[in-house]
């Protein structure tokens, strides 16, 4: 076992860690993807003084932003504030995060020569992330900290497309037309993802979540052939840390079984489910012993409290049916990230409701 796993915090009262490890929590655990973000006025006040990338590389800012939703909402887990492209910066990729657009890659990776020129992650480039984790482990008390990284496929899409994409056409075309370069690229990105998560795990995160945001653009056959082996290597490389690992993508109903299989080496496995798939149905698609996370539609939070309450109760009930159907546990979350226009008061009330059920 990795030496850091032996010194990790012992959090026996954590509902989140109980649920993902297959134990019965004393309350339904809840946290939100993108809980640290533009829905919070305190976050917007900080970001008015710092651009996104500067914020991601300032350990004290990362700590403060990560803590904000824990203080405000009483969520059962914190997730490290970062951006999916931070490890690419750690590997020397020239990029920027453009307001209203997202990550923009200065020189997209589209040829075998581009792939060959890619460099590995340099740990010293992402040292502020490790520093932030250490600050958070000290500040969070009994609340677990979830580490964060993008999966190789989603990172590949940003690199190939040059930024966010609706159809991922260049990505899929390269994957199919030049599989040798594709797999070489994915191997390099797998190493980058593993390295970035090792930095966080060595600093003390209690769990990790790997976001394959764009995997839903793929067929099951293409996912299995071109993506799953690389994602599986991420989780296998980190299994000796002994922490729970979550695998999440959007629009991945047909991929849930394969995404769950990729997690298999991990000691405790969780699959994130979006709002398109019932949790009880997802429980029949994933590997035995897998916990589920999700899956309230983020848009529901804009529809007024009566709608939110009804939908939240339905998700909790569905989570219980999922456990009855074989899921190891259920963590209440959204099916994707909190929308910027979400009223933070609704999120606070939602946490209180879920805890009461």
Curated annotation (Swiss-Prot):
Substrate binds at residues 34-38, 83, 158, 213, 336. GO terms for molecular function: uroporphyrinogen decarboxylase activity. It comes from Mycobacterium avium (strain 104). PROSITE patterns: UROD_1, UROD_2. Belongs to the uroporphyrinogen decarboxylase family. This is Uroporphyrinogen decarboxylase. Pfam families: URO-D. It catalyses: uroporphyrinogen III + 4 H(+) = coproporphyrinogen III + 4 CO2. The gene is hemE. Its EC number is 4.1.1.37. Catalyzes the decarboxylation of four acetate groups of uroporphyrinogen-III to yield coproporphyrinogen-III. SUPFAM superfamilies: UROD/MetE-like. Pathway: Porphyrin-containing compound metabolism; protoporphyrin-IX biosynthesis; coproporphyrinogen-III from 5-aminolevulinate: step 4/4. The keyword Translocase does not apply. The lineage of its organism: Bacteria, Bacillati, Actinomycetota, Actinomycetes, Mycobacteriales. GO terms for cellular component: cytosol. Keywords: Cytoplasm, Decarboxylase, Lyase, Porphyrin biosynthesis.
């Amino acid at each position: 076992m990795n030496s850091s796993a032996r010194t990790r915090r012992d959090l026996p009262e954590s509902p989140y860690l109980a649920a993902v490890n297959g134990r019965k929590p004393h309350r339904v655990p809840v946290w939100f993807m993108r809980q640290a973000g533009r829905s919070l006025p305190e976050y917007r006040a900080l970001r008015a003084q710092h651009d996104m990338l500067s914020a991601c590389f300032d350990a004290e800012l990362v700590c403060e932003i990560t803590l904000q939703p824990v203080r405000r909402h009483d969520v059962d887990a914190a997730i490290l504030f970062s951006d999916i492209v931070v490890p690419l910066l750690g590997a020397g990729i020239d990029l920027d995060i453009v307001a209203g657009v997202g990550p923009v890659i200065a020189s997209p990776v589209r040829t075998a020569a581009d792939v060959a020129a890619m460099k590995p992650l340099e740990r010293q480039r992402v040292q502020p992330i490790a520093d932030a984790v250490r600050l958070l482990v000290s500040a969070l008390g009994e609340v677990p900290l979830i580490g964060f990284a993008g999966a190789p496929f989603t990172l590949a899409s940003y690199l190939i497309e040059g930024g966010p994409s609706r159809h991922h056409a260049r990505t899929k075309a390269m994957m199919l037309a030049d599989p040798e370069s594709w797999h070489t690229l994915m191997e390099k990105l797998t190493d980058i993802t593993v390295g970035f998560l090792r930095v966080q795990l060595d600093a003390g995160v209690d769990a990790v979540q790997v976001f394959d945001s764009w995997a839903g653009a793929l067929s099951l056959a293409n996912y299995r052939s071109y993506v799953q082996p690389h994602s599986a290597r991420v989780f296998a490389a980190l299994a000796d840390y002994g922490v729970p690992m979550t695998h999440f993508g959007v629009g991945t109903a047909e991929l849930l079984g394969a995404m769950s299989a990729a997690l298999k080496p991990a000691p405790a496995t969780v699959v994130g489910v979006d709002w398109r798939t019932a949790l009880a149905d997802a429980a029949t698609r994933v590997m035995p012993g897998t916990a589920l996370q999700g899956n309230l539609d983020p848009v529901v939070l804009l529809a007024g409290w009566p709608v939110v309450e009804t939908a939240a109760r339905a998700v909790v009930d569905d989570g219980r049916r999922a456990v009855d159907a074989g899921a190891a546990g259920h963590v209440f979350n959204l099916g994707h990230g909190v929308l910027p226009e979400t009223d933070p008061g609704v999120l606070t009330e939602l946490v209180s409701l879920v805890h009461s059920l």
